[in-house]
Amino acid sequence: MEYRELPHGDEAISVIGMGSSVVGAQKEADIIKTVRHALDCGVNYFDMAGGHAAIFPAYGKALEGRRKDAMLQVHFGADYTGGEYGWSTKLDVIKRSIEWQLKNLKTDYIDFGFIHCLDEQGDLAAYEKNGALKFILDMQAQGVVRHLGLSTHTPEMANCVLDMKLIDVMMFSINPMYDYGQGEFAIGSANERMDLYRRCEAEGVGISVMKPFNAGQLLDAKKSPFHQALTTTQCIQYALDKPGVLTVLGGPGSM
């Protein structure tokens, strides 16, 4: 496994990370097996913004005795207390969800605490007004959150938060479709997106890449707008070649 160093820290992050959206639909035993296999293969970076609450107790069991081997990307605004994914900027919801996530992950710290999925100015305004931003900053000051991050699909919001000088990592969608104007989250021109990647690199903000295969669409010639299937390796390398990228988060279904 290859590793890249976090610019604002000394963590060595595996260039291949693991997303949790797909694996979260599996049985608990299969989730545990997949996470442990990923660790054995040298994967050490895991995103926790999946679609199902089941990933949290499963990860908690998978990481027993191995918590130091994993870095978790936990989202302040992703709510799982109802059993499935929900999104909120309300402080009480975020506090309740983070408490629940920590309990089920069986951990007392968060490697990367993310301001979750802010795609519009109104989202950031609500996050600040409701006290959610202060909450995550307070948790960082207390040492519970080690690094701050942001997940977004829009270059505009990414640049807005970069201006605030708060984050060490940004989660952003990078794949050939989005960079060249194809797909739901193809937001911003190719030049705007590349300028963002270069800014992150220049300012020492690492990028963790989501949606590298666009839910498998790029791997299927019949579904791809390019009418040609790419391999998983091609998609991963495409993202890793972009400025600022530390890790690419694929979403395995199971082993």
Regions found by a protein language model. Name each.
Residues 6, 18, 46, 59, ...:
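Conserved, mostly hydrophobic/aromatic
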Residues 7-23, 73-85, 114-117, 213-217:
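N-terminal small/glycine-rich loop or linker at the start of catalytic domains
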Residues 11-16, 42-45, 66-71, 107-111, ...:
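Short, well-ordered coil/turn segments that N-cap beta-strands
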Residues 16-29, 78-95, 121-125, 220-229:
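Active-site mouth loops of central-metabolism enzymes
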